[in-house]
Curated annotation (Swiss-Prot):
Subcellular location(s) of the protein: Cytoplasm; Nucleus
Name under which the protein is recorded: Probable proteasome subunit beta type-2
Biological-process GO terms, alphabetical: proteasome-mediated ubiquitin-dependent protein catabolic process
Keyword Transferase: no
The reaction(s) this protein catalyses: Cleavage of peptide bonds with very broad specificity
Gene3D superfamilies (UniProt xref): Glutamine Phosphoribosylpyrophosphate, subunit 1, domain 1 (3.60.20.10)
Keywords: Cytoplasm, Hydrolase, Nucleus, Protease, Proteasome, Threonine protease, Zymogen
Family as reported in the entry's similarity comment: Belongs to the peptidase T1B family.
Gene from which the chain derives: pup1
Top-rank taxon: Eukaryota
Organism in which the protein naturally occurs: Schizosaccharomyces pombe (strain 972 / ATCC 24843) (Fission yeast)
Positions of the propeptide segment: 1-35
Active site (record annotation): 36
Enzyme Commission number: 3.4.25.1
UniProt GO molecular function: endopeptidase activity; threonine-type endopeptidase activity
Length: 267
């Protein structure tokens, strides 16, 4: 039997408290956000997902090597943009549910199954879960690539880009994407799109991570590209003789001898 003070469901008391504190001028805490550029491309016989590795908290870089590619199942991966905690926990929860579904049905999970679970969960919260996802995988029906917005809407496209750097990334994809790309071509295209977001968006930065999903397995590439790698500062720089080419040589005599007339002195 439930006690008198026992509550079920949502409790909105803290919501009213937060509004009152905000009206009195107290600053609201900022969630860690993955400013982000995430990209997905369907290739000839695989799916390639990519993401940068910068996480921000307002104007501050909170993490330089954040992991934005999440494992849903061995044949399904997800790239996340938005609030870092939301993307982490939503993908972790769906990964657990997909594993239970796979054990119950005794077969390899479908990509649309993960898509449906994510859409239903996000729609239930009407966008208050800040997770914007690129879902990619390879199942019995072939390769699939979807985008999922925080409100629960989705799209199925051959190439996608999400996040604050998506405008720069999608310009690269629209220019260079072709159907039936080879594996290495798709990887280089995704890398170039991510780097476009890194160099043209302050919320994206650091390294480029990739994952390639084919019919047999998924292969992640952590730190596939490091366009902003910082070198160790040396105390003394030395260069080999001949490093700098000599373009022109002029020789000047700084010591000159001049003959002068003897000075006459009146006595």
């Amino acid at each position: 039997m439930m006690g008198i003070n026992e509550r079920k469901g949502f409790d909105f008391e803290y919501y009213q408290r937060n509004l009152l504190l905000q009206e009195k001028g107290f600053p609201t805490p900022k969630a860690t956000s993955t400013g982000t550029t995430i990209v997905g491309v369907i290739a000839k016989d695989c799916i390639v997902l990519g993401a940068d590795t910068r996480a921000t908290a307002g104007p501050i870089i909170a993490d330089k090597n954040c992991k934005k590619l999440h494992l849903i199942s061995p044949n399904i991966w997800c790239a996340g943009a938005g609030t870092a905690a939301d993307t982490e926990f939503v993908t972790s929860m769906i990964s657990s549910n997909i594993e239970l579904h796979s054990l119950y049905t005794n077969r390899k999970p479908r990509v649309v199954t993960a898509l449906t679970m994510l859409k239903q969960h996000l729609f239930r919260y009407q966008g208050h879960i800040g997770a914007y996802l690129v879902l990619g995988g390879y199942d019995c029906k072939g390769p699939h690539l979807f985008t999922i917005a925080a409100h629960g809407s989705s799209d199925k496209l051959p190439y996608v880009a999400l996040g604050s750097g998506s405008l720069a990334a999608i310009s690269v994809l629209e220019t260079k994407y072709q159907p039936d790309l080879e594996r290495h071509e798709a990887m280089e295209l995704v890398k170039e799109a991510i780097e476009a977001g890194i160099f043209n968006d302050l919320g994206s930065g650091s390294n480029c991570d990739l994952v390639v999903i084919d019919e047999e397995k998924a292969t992640p590439y952590r730190g596939y590209s490091k366009p902003n790698e910082r070198a160790t500062k040396q105390s003394k720089y030395t260069y080999d003789r001949g490093t700098t080419a000599v373009l022109k040589e002029d020789i000047y005599k700084f010591v000159t001898v001049q003959d002068l007339d003897e000075m006459q002195v009146d006595v």
